[in-house]
Design a protein with these regions (language model features):
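Hydrophobic transmembrane alpha-helical segments in integral membrane proteins
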Residues: 2-29
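Signal-transducing coiled-coil linker helices
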Residues: 204-210
Length: 210
């Protein structure tokens, strides 16, 4: 998801990556600010945490956009670890909204293998792409399951839009990992797009909006 796209043959649906990054960053910042204003003093309905998650998402994508301009430890290691924390925060926000107990140690656990694997495979693009895509894909499905588990008692149709976005993002991530593992890889830069890279950032943008 958040590493250079290796599928250069899949160019029929490739958008401009810097534009998509800017889109995700701007939307995350604006929605985070809006939620912060709306939340006010409320701290227990998940919205305050959701605002923080959106801010972290903006920071993570800003670091990705700075690939080649800042040290790799920031644009690769920190960025991908923050993205794992974004999914963790999303899961916890859903649990908090549903009135379920906090499970921070559990939901943050995937950030540990992300940090370890990205550092180990810092110079191995293909392995890093597979590892990050699999872990983030599993986290996306986890967030989807958290919403699904209480769908019958949650009021509103917004949950279905969120589930659709999370399901699509998880699918794109896991398909990308599968293709990276099975196809020859030619390393290109993060700012060069391919079809799956485009779909990944588009689904990220959709989840932010939902």
């Amino acid at each position: 998801m958040y590493a250079p796209g290796p599928f250069s043959a899949m160019t029929s649906f490739a958008a401009d990556v810097p534009t998509m990054l800017a889109m995700v960053i701007a939307s995350s910042l604006l929605l985070s600010a809006a939620l912060t204003v709306v939340v006010g003093g409320r701290q227990h309905d998940g919205l305050a945490l959701w605002a923080l998650v959106l801010l972290l998402n903006a920071v993570a994508h800003a670091l990705l956009a700075l690939r080649g301009l800042v040290p790799d430890v920031l644009s690769i290691v920190v960025a991908n670890t923050l993205l794992s924390c974004v999914f963790a925060g999303l899961i916890q926000a859903v649990l908090q909204f549903q009135g379920r107990p906090a499970r921070w140690a559990l939901v943050l656990a995937p950030a540990v293998p992300i940090l370890f694997l990205v550092m180990v495979f810092l110079d191995d693009f293909q392995a890093r792409l597979i590892a990050v895509s699999v872990v983030l894909g599993v986290q996306a499905y986890w967030a989807l399951w958290a919403v699904l588990a209480r769908r019958r008692v949650t009021v509103g149709r917004g949950q279905w839009l969120l589930m659709a976005g999370l399901g699509l993002e998880a699918l794109v991530l896991l398909v990308r990992a599968s293709l990276a593992a099975s196809l020859p890889t030619t390393q290109i830069g993060l700012l060069q797009g391919d079809t799956l890279q485009t779909l990944t950032f588009m689904t990220t943008f959709c989840v932010v909006l939902l």
